[in-house]
């Protein structure tokens, strides 16, 4: 049986980075704190409960997210740390994480036979080589379909 993988973006998908006051100015100033300050876009108790059920059905949970557009080795390290800490703080049960250079084609990062991408970026979803879930809509409904085997 092929492994089933659910791949999540972070910013604008599960973390409300764009809701942090001054987020863009901060990132342009090589300040990673907006990644730490971002609030979840969903009730995380419900979200994480659904992910645990999905995992119990044999799915792997992968986070694939871009680093900031502005980049230095030290800043990239701070962004990686902030994103990992955000996932830990909110208890997201992931199996694998890929924090990659801004603009990296996400369809080249994970290579599983059956994988579903959850992302807010239409261009990224269009380049994906499998099923996608539009994170601009309520993803909880789509995740419940996976839980009930209706996906």
Residue locations for each model-derived region?
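Donor nucleotide-activated moiety binding/catalytic core segment of transferases
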Residues: 94-115
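Conserved beta-strand termini and adjacent loop/short-helix elements that scaffold enzyme active sites
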Residues: 64, 99-102, 135
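Short beta->alpha connector loops
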Residues: 45, 100-104, 122
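Short catalytic/ligand-binding loop motif for oxyanion handling, primarily in non-cytosolic enzymes
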Residues: 15-18, 70-74, 105-109, 124-127, ...
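Acidic, Mg2+-coordinating phosphoryl-transfer loop and its flanking beta/alpha structural elements
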Residues: 115-151
């Amino acid at each position: 049986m092929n492994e089933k993988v659910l791949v999540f973006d972070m910013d604008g998908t599960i973390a409300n980075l764009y809701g942090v006051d001054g987020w863009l100015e901060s990132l342009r100033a090589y300040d990673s704190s907006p990644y730490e300050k971002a609030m979840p876009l969903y009730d995380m108790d419900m979200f994480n409960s659904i992910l645990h059920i999905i995992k119990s059905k044999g799915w792997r949970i992968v986070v694939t997210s871009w680093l900031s557009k502005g980049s230095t080795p030290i800043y990239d390290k701070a962004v990686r740390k902030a994103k990992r800490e955000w996932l830990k703080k909110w208890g997201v049960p992931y199996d694998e994480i890929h924090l990659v250079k801004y603009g990296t084609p996400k369809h080249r990062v994970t290579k599983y036979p059956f994988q579903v991408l959850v992302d807010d970026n239409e261009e990224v979803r269009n380049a994906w080589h499998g099923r996608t879930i539009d994170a601009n809509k309520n993803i909880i409904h789509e995740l419940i379909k996976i839980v009930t085997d209706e996906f």
